[in-house]
């Protein structure tokens, strides 16, 4: 009798995606982050669902309801902190996953890559709206500052901002709709992740060499299932260390003060995972220019396949490109640091130089390094 997992209409989909899937024999731990992102998403949906059972999306009670979750709900504190720090783990995995794609040339899978960029935007939108929900000072002012950026759009800007707000400022209507969107978006992300996986399985996985691995494939189960379980255990260990020992390490103390439209915090800043983009936004004195730079800082990923000038796919055997890649990583860390600093000397000029270097590296220096690499190998 043929195995049921290979014949059953539902089980064979799972089988072809996670069990009998032919996988390259040499993919490293950098390939673990896709499955870790899936785990993060499931964890966020589950903890978020339990939080939504006790949360009220109303300006008068939102802050109190979060306090109630932490004080009165059974294990509410751990659910709340798992959700908040789970977002940080999500973005660590996301940035690593994208970095892996850049380093090993995975962006040559065009559809997979483009769906991935859409996933990144959707996740960033979800995280931003989630940060508004506790209705603390940084929630309110973060929402005000970021939504206000849309007013830089010529002609329709002001109307667009007021339409998103549902009034003339960030208020009850804004909070209610942000909760609605924050609830629905993770399910859209889950659907997009399935599309992402669908396109990936059309081509099969890339591998560190960037060479076709069709000649040497192994089944996903048990080899990569056990490897993914190890990754998942390490992820959960890191998350729980964060949650149980320093749950507020990555948060902002200002968010423990209820939102007050009459009192602006001295330094408005987003969560750490948006600081690099925030630094790029602030480094341009012009409002519209800053908004465009902010969007382009992420949208530039779409251009990666067009900017690939090397004859090799992966950076594994390209020392010059590797050097540029790690300079880019260092630059992003610098931007993250600058985004959390006040707007004063010397942080302004450092932020501007780091922003220029960011775009220069991706648009000019990395393609040039690839071309020089080709010429050195007489290609």
Curated annotation (Swiss-Prot):
> What does it do?
Component of the ubiquinol-cytochrome c reductase complex (complex III or cytochrome b-c1 complex) that is part of the mitochondrial respiratory chain. The b-c1 complex mediates electron transfer from ubiquinol to cytochrome c. Contributes to the generation of a proton gradient across the mitochondrial membrane that is then used for ATP synthesis.
Cellular localisation:
Mitochondrion inner membrane
Matches recorded under PROSITE patterns:
CYTB_CTER (PS51003), CYTB_NTER (PS51002)
Keyword annotations of the record: Electron transport, Heme, Iron, Membrane, Metal-binding, Mitochondrion, Mitochondrion inner membrane, Respiratory chain, Transmembrane, Transmembrane helix, Transport, Ubiquinone
Known cofactor(s): heme b
Cofactor remark from the record? Binds 2 heme b groups non-covalently.
Q: Where are the transmembrane segments?
A: 33-53, 77-98, 113-133, 178-198, 226-246, 288-308, 320-340, 347-367
- Name the source's superkingdom: Eukaryota
Q: Gene3D superfamilies in the record, alphabetically?
A: Cytochrome Bc1 Complex, Chain C
Tell me more from the record. Heme 1 (or BL or b562) is low-potential and absorbs at about 562 nm, and heme 2 (or BH or b566) is high-potential and absorbs at about 566 nm.
**Where heme b b566 is bound, by residue?**
97, 196
Protein's recorded name: Cytochrome b
Q: Which Pfam families match?
A: Cytochrom_B_C (PF00032), Cytochrome_B (PF00033)
Any one Gene Ontology biological process term? mitochondrial electron transport, ubiquinol to cytochrome c
Q: Which organism is it from?
A: Antidorcas marsupialis (Springbok)
Record: residues binding heme b b562? 83, 182
- Positions of a ubiquinone binding: 201
Gene Ontology cellular component list: mitochondrial inner membrane; respiratory chain complex III
Which residue stretches, if any, does this entry annotate as coiled coil? Answer: none
Subunit text:
The cytochrome bc1 complex contains 11 subunits: 3 respiratory subunits (MT-CYB, CYC1 and UQCRFS1), 2 core proteins (UQCRC1 and UQCRC2) and 6 low-molecular weight proteins (UQCRH/QCR6, UQCRB/QCR7, UQCRQ/QCR8, UQCR10/QCR9, UQCR11/QCR10 and a cleavage product of UQCRFS1). This cytochrome bc1 complex then forms a dimer.
Instruction: Please give, as recorded in its UniProt entry, the membrane topology of this protein.
Output: Multi-pass membrane protein
């Amino acid at each position: 009798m043929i195995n049921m997992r290979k014949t059953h209409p539902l089980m064979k989909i799972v089988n072809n995606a996670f069990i009998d899937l032919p996988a390259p024999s040499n993919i490293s731990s950098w390939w673990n982050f896709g499955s870790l992102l899936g785990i993060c998403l499931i964890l966020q949906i589950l903890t978020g669902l339990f939080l939504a059972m006790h949360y009220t999306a109303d300006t008068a009670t939102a802050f109190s309801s979060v306090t109630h979750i932490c004080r009165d709900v059974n294990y509410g504190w751990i659910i709340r902190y798992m959700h908040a720090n789970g977002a940080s783990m999500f973005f660590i995995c996301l940035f690593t996953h994208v970095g892996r794609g850049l380093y090993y040339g995975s962006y040559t899978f065009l559809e997979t890559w483009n769906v991935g960029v859409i996933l990144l935007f959707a996740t960033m939108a979800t995280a931003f709206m989630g940060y508004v929900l506790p209705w603390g000072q940084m929630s309110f002012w973060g929402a005000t500052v970021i939504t206000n950026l849309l007013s830089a759009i010529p002609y329709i800007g002001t109307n667009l901002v007021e339409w998103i707000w549902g009034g003339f400022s960030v208020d009850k209507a804004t909070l209610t709709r942000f909760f609605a969107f924050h609830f629905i978006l993770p399910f859209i992300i889950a659907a997009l992740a399935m599309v992402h996986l669908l396109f990936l399985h059309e081509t099969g996985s890339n591998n560190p060499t960037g060479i076709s691995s069709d000649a040497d494939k192994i089944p996903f189960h048990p080899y990569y299932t056990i490897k993914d379980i190890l990754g998942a255990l390490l992820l959960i260990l890191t998350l729980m260390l964060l949650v149980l020992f320093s749950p507020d390490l990555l948060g902002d103390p200002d968010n423990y003060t209820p939102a007050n439209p009459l009192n602006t915090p001295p330094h408005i800043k987003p969560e750490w995972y948006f600081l690099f983009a925030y630094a790029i936004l602030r480094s341009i004195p012009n409002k519209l220019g800053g908004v465009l730079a902010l969007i382009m800082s992420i949208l530039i990923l779409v251009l990666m396949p067009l900017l690939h000038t090397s004859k090799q796919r992966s950076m594994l055997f390209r020392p010059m490109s590797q050097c540029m890649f790690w300079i880019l990583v260092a630059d992003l860390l610098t931007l993250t640091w600058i985004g959390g600093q006040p707007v004063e000397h010397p942080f302004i000029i450092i932020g501007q130089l780091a922003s220029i270097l960011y775009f220069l590296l991706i648009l000019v220096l990395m393609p040039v390094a690839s071309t020089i690499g080709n010429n050195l190998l007489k290609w």
